[in-house]
Amino acid sequence: MSSFDLPAPSPPRCSPQFPSIGQEPPEMNLYYENFFHPQGMPSPQRPTSFEGGGEYGTTPNPYLWLNGPAMTPPPYLPGTNASPFLPQAYGMQRQLLPSDLGWLPIPSQEELMKLVRPPYSYSALIAMAIHGAPDQRLTLSQIYQYVADNFPFYNKSKAGWQNSIRHNLSLNDCFKKVPRDEDDPGKGNYWTLDPNCEKMFDNGNFRRKRKRKSDSSSSTSSLASEKTENGLLASSPKPTEPQEVLDTASPDTTTSSPEKRSSPAPSGTPCLNNFLSTMTAYVSGTNPISRSVATPGLSSEPIDKMGQNSLNFNSYTPLTNLSSHGNGGEWANPVATNALGYGGSVFNQFSPHFYNSINTNGILFPREGTEV
């Protein structure tokens, strides 16, 4: 390095290539001038004055210097005060050169795949070892040896996976312990495969697999079917319910039990729909006939007003079942009707919650002479 004097202003030809961003002292510009040649573009390139100049060729990217030994940074460029065009990771990137990874031989892709954890469970590894044995049985040490020889991944941390092998042998029902014969030298029992557990490995494919739905549901299919049948029988209607419906449709509904009177009425009964529409028209005052018809024994108060006072549709509850086939005589024979065109026997078929508000004994609908 030649001696030089520190000028007050920095050289003008270095400022375009190496702009100062306020992080390095002004003296660094002079170092850039003496040790780095200006380039046509400010893109990061390896300077040609390092390590003898002509020994290395110029490369477009300093992160791809993988053709030579590692370089040491010059003493005048510490890592904390690196220039803007040399990033902070420049010194760290050189630690990952192939020369530093010489202990890792990768001759082929197959060798690389042996260093990856195999996609087999410990139970599958045990099954593979036992299945490949001549006598279809192995000792614990022989299973260890098979796993270590065929899968180099398990050469490290042997204590961990060997403990898992022992747990799988003792807890998995697919592995059976066979005592050693008296004339067989050595120690330790043999382990063999249960013939009933062949399905867990998919016909020789020892990869991890999900449990089949057919296998999981076969053991509980009969129990589930019995529960379903019992539930359907419990939710089905009793055979005596139609008889109860016929009983509730008889005229002596007032003497029937409360359970029978609480049965819901079918919504599609035409007689009931006609009756409700007529009653609604009567209460709202849209029926012109109801205003002019008078009933003997009533006061001078209009009928529509009395109907509004006596009828309370807000407290209306579902009516009992009305059967149009059980009482055909009442509907077929002509009877005397009241102002709404219905006989008194018709109102006896509804629940007491409804006709408690309708006096069927002489206020609106007299019953004298209406019974057949």
From Swiss-Prot:
Subcellular location: Nucleus
Tissue-by-tissue expression: Expressed in intercalated cells of the epithelium of the distal renal tubule.
A Pfam family per the record: Forkhead
GO CC annotations on file: nucleolus; nucleus
Region listing for Disordered, in residue ranges: 1-23, 202-271
InterPro entries per UniProt: Fork_head_dom, FOX_domain-containing, TF_fork_head_CS_1, TF_fork_head_CS_2, WH-like_DNA-bd_sf, WH_DNA-bd_sf
Keywords annotated in UniProt: Activator, Deafness, DNA-binding, Nucleus, Transcription, Transcription regulation
GO biological process: inner ear morphogenesis; positive regulation of DNA-templated transcription; positive regulation of transcription by RNA polymerase II
Recorded GO MF terms: DNA-binding transcription activator activity, RNA polymerase II-specific; RNA polymerase II cis-regulatory region sequence-specific DNA binding; sequence-specific DNA binding; transcription cis-regulatory region binding
DNA-binding feature ranges: 117-211
Disruption phenotype annotation: Mice are deaf, impaired in their sense of balance and suffer from distal renal tubular acidosis.
Keyword Transcription appears in the UniProt entry: yes
Biased composition (Low complexity): 216-225, 247-257
Keyword presence, DNA-binding: yes
PANTHER family recorded: FORKHEAD BOX PROTEIN, FORKHEAD BOX PROTEIN I1
Functional note: Transcriptional activator required for the development of normal hearing, sense of balance and kidney function. Required for the expression of SLC26A4/PDS, JAG1 and COCH in a subset of epithelial cells and the development of the endolymphatic system in the inner ear. Also required for the expression of SLC4A1/AE1, SLC4A9/AE4, ATP6V1B1 and the differentiation of intercalated cells in the epithelium of distal renal tubules.
Protein name: Forkhead box protein I1
Species, as recorded: Mus musculus
Organism ancestry: Eukaryota, Metazoa, Chordata, Craniata, Vertebrata
